[in-house]
């Protein structure tokens, strides 16, 4: 068993449910893409599977699931295991490099509001921005 930590606020703890979900994806051949404050992302069958403990992210993913948007990753499926653990299946995007244009942030905030998402709940920072490599 691998030991990993999930960071929630300032508390580090081992979450066996999180590890169980990660292990399922890895056992199916998922390739680790990266980890952040609240989860880890894996590439499997041409999609990104993100295991997250961020309940707000899960709520946003549920709202965006199946919708075509201009500024958010396409969400195919959302599996909520419990309010603080879930798996989001989304499109594969490329890494963003550079500065975040103010106009883009304004567009994201506007689109979030159109979908009923509070823009103040968005975590806009370079490490959370991905780009569509096909465009």
Stretch-by-stretch model annotation:
Residues 29-66:
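ATP-binding glycine-rich loop module of kinase domains
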Residues 43-46, 92, 132:
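Active-site beta-strand termini and strand-to-loop segments that position acidic
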Residues 70-108:
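Conserved structural core of kinase catalytic domains
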Residues 102-120:
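A generic "structured core" feature
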């Amino acid at each position: 068993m691998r030991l990993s930590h999930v960071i929630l606020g300032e508390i580090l703890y081992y979450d066996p449910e999180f590890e169980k979900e990660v292990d399922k994806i890895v056992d199916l051949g998922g390739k680790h893409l990266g980890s952040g404050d609240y989860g880890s992302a894996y590439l499997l069958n041409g999609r990104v599977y993100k295991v997250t403990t961020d309940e707000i992210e899960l709520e946003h993913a549920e709202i965006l699931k199946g919708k075509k948007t201009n500024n958010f990753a396409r969400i195919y499926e959302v599996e909520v295991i419990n309010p603080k653990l879930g798996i989001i299946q989304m499109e594969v995007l490329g890494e963003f490099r550079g500065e975040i244009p103010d106009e883009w942030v304004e567009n994201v905030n506007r689109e979030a509001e159109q979908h009923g998402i509070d823009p103040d709940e968005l975590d806009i920072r370079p490490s959370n921005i991905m780009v569509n490599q096909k465009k």
